[in-house]
Curated annotation (Swiss-Prot):
It is found in: Nucleus. InterPro entries: Cyclin-dep_Kinase_2_interact. One of its GO terms (biological process) is ribosomal large subunit biogenesis. It comes from the Eukaryota. Homodimer. Part of the 55LCC heterohexameric ATPase complex composed at least of AIRIM, AFG2A, AFG2B and CINP. Interacts with AIRIM. Interacts with CDK2 and CDC7. Interacts with the components of the replication complex, MCM2, MCM3, MCM4, MCM5, MCM6, MCM7 and with ORC2-containing complexes. Interacts with ATRIP. Interacts with CEP152. Associates with pre-60S ribosomal particles. This is Cyclin-dependent kinase 2-interacting protein. The modification Phosphoserine is found at residues 69, 73. The gene is CINP. One of its GO terms (cellular component) is nucleus. Transmembrane segments: none annotated. It comes from Bos taurus. Phosphorylated by CDC7 but not by CDK2. The keyword DNA repair applies.
Amino acid sequence: MEAKTLGTVTPRKPVLSVSARKIKDNAADWHNLILKWETLNDGGFATANSIANMKISLSSKDKIELASSGLASNDCAEKEHPEYSRELETLCEELQATLEGLTKIQMKMEKLSSTTKGVCELEDYHHGEERKRPPLFHTWPTAHFYEVSRKLSDMYSQELRLKRTVVEQLAHTADRDLALSYLSMWLHQPYLEAGSWLLLESMLLETGHRVL
C-alpha cells in the first residue's frame, strides 16, 4: 500500500474580533500618516531654507545698496529686485501647500483618535469593566490604545500650530538669526517628543505589525 504524503499544515492565525481588527487597522494608519508627515516635513524644510536664504541674501544686498539712504531694506526689496519677489512668492506658495498637506494629515490623526475612542466605548458597553475582560491582543487594556492615539494627536496638533506660525512669519523676516530660528523649529519639531516614535512602535508591536 502506498504511503500517503501529508502536506505541510500552516498554523491558523487567531481570528480577531471586530474591535481588534479596527484597532489593528488604526495602528497601521498611524504608521502611514506619520511617514507621510515626515516626508512632507523634509520637503517643507528644503523650501523654508530656500526662503530664508533668499531673504537674507536680499537683505544684505539692500543694506549695501542703500547704505547712504534712510530707507529700510525691505521697503525697496520688491522695487529693486523684482526677480527675487517672483521667486519668493513661488516658494511661499510651495510652503503653504506643504502646510495644507500637513493639516490634512493632522485631521486624519484626529479622526483616528476619535474612532479608537469609539471602539473603547463599544467594548465597555458590550463587555463591562476593563479589568474583567482579556486584552484584545497581548497586554494592553483597550483604553490604552485611545490614550496613545490621543497623546500622538495632541503632539502633532501643537506641531502644526508652530509650523503655521513659521509659514506666516518666515517670508517677512529679514533678520538672519530669527530666520535660522524658524528653520530650526521646523526641522527639529520640538512638540514631537522623543517618545512619539516609541509610542508608535509600541502600538505596532502590541497589535502584531511588529515582531520581537
